[in-house]
């Protein structure tokens, strides 16, 4: 069997898996409705299981924060679950459990989220609960200190762990003054200043109908969901008071940072600025990242770990962003091997710029990438999340299908082209017990 034939079969298998995982979990494509007040509703009818999931995204996150309030979005999301005008924190939790599901909240760079699940027969009460938390949180002052302490503890913990510390450092260096360079947990000094009134003002600024995306997936009908959501969110403010932030440009620059810290494993991270999700090069960079660092068959694993024995762990990542993206590779190694491991990893980054990936490598990367994507979209909770996520990133909920087709169309020449375009100005961070 030729390499081209094997490549075609591998991609076909991955697309079949993608279809089974996503198609079997969804009886319809998401139906998009924009209410008169500006709120966006995405409904995916799926009668395969008697479960309903809702993901409420609001365009609020670290991208809209400054050094003075860094971490406020994550803090707000946690405190919102501590009580509303009609429910205490215990009643929120008990209501969610009584519906046969749960509720949680979090913040990220480009969005913040309230997510909840329930048995399908309880979907209206589920919407009641989500709307209550989103629109009527009391943000009790007595709960703020506890959540703040938890975030400060998590920040200190990241400073004590080699990989999180190295990752936070490389993000800060590659992004410079851009808000993506700050941890989602924020800055300790900023968190100490945030009080009840500050959280109330932040909530009022961002939780407005034009900034809200509500995705619902499950055994429901779109017409009924739209009507019920419109009724529950009728009181949401229609004014847009938080325009897109004026962000400094993230400019590619060669940079090297050495962190000296006691650690059983040395860390080496190499990062590059990369295109946002909406960019035409996004699928090709995803394939590039997978060919290098995706799973046990990626070049970094096979060449640096298996063949040369220079790493305990290694991989690559290219997170999806609305703004400038980042692609990074990472390895953990014995401190004595740090210098050689870094040379080996940089060598693989150089080789993928010089040499096209083989047909089998290309097929494996596509199969792994599409297979993992399909497997991650098997539940209503993940379907709702992806629908809201892609809408928040500005590519629309139908991006999942377009993305699969775009990945299938990526060629070896595309992979080499984006490698030569984006893997040119490395930001390197090393961490170990002594300068290596």
PLM features: residue spans?
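His/Glu-based metal-binding/catalytic segments typifying zinc-dependent metallopeptidases
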Residues: 241-297
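Bacterial N-terminal signal peptides that target proteins for export
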Residues: 1-12
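Bacterial N-terminal signal peptides
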Residues: 10-20
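Mature N-terminal segment immediately following signal peptide/propeptide cleavage
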Residues: 28-57
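Charge-rich, well-structured scaffold segments of protease-associated domains
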Residues: 34, 91-241, 258, 276, ...
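M16/MPP (pitrilysin/insulinase) zinc-metallopeptidase core fold and M16-derived inactive scaffolds
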Residues: 48, 53-120, 183, 295-310
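Boundary at the C-terminal end of the N-terminal hydrophobic targeting segment
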Residues: 21-27
């Amino acid at each position: 069997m030729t390499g081209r034939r094997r490549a075609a079969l591998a991609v076909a298998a991955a697309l079949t898996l993608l279809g089974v995982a996503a198609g079997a979990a969804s009886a319809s494509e998401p139906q998009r409705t924009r209410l008169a007040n500006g709120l966006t509703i995405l409904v995916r009818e799926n009668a395969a299981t008697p479960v309903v999931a809702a993901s409420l995204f609001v365009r609020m996150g670290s991208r809209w924060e400054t050094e003075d309030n860094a971490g406020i979005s994550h803090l707000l999301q946690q405190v919102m679950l501590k009580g509303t005008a009609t429910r205490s924190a215990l009643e929120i939790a008990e209501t969610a459990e009584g519906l046969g599901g749960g509720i949680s909240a979090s913040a990220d760079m480009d969005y913040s989220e309230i997510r909840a699940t329930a048995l399908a027969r309880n979907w209206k009460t589920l919407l009641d609960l989500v709307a209550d938390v989103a629109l009527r949180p009391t943000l009790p002052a007595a709960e703020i200190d506890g959540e703040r302490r938890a975030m400060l503890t998590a920040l200190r913990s990241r400073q004590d762990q080699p990989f999180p510390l190295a990752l936070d450092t490389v993000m800060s260096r590659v992004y410079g003054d851009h808000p993506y360079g700050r941890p989602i947990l924020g800055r300790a000094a900023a968190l100490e200043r945030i009080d009840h009134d500050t959280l109330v003002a932040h909530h009022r600024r961002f939780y407005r109908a034009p900034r809200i995306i509500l995705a619902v997936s499950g055994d429901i009908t779109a017409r009924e969901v739209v009507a019920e959501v419109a009724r529950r969110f009728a009181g949401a403010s229609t004014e847009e008071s938080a325009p897109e932030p004026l962000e400094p440009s993230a400019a590619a620059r060669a940079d090297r940072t050495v962190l000296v810290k006691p650690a059983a494993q040395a860390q080496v991270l190499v990062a590059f600025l990369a295109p946002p999700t909406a960019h035409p090069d996004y699928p090709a960079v995803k394939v590039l990242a997978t060919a290098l660092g995706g799973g046990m068959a990626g070049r970094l694993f096979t060449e640096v770990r298996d063949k040369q024995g220079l790493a305990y762990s290694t991989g690559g990542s290219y997170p999806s962003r609305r703004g400038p993206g980042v692609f990074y590779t990472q390895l953990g190694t014995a401190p004595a091997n740090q210098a050689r491991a870094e040379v080996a990893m940089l060598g693989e980054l150089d080789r993928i710029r010089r040499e096209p990936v083989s047909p089998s490598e290309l097929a494996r990367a596509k199969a792994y990438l599409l297979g993992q994507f399909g497997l991650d979209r098997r539940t209503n909770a993940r379907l709702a999340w992806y629908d809201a996520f892609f809408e928040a990133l500005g590519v629309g909920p139908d991006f999942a299908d377009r993305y699969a087709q775009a990945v299938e169309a990526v060629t070896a020449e595309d992979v080499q082209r984006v490698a030569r375009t984006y893997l040119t100005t490395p930001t390197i961070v090393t961490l170990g017990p002594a300068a290596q």
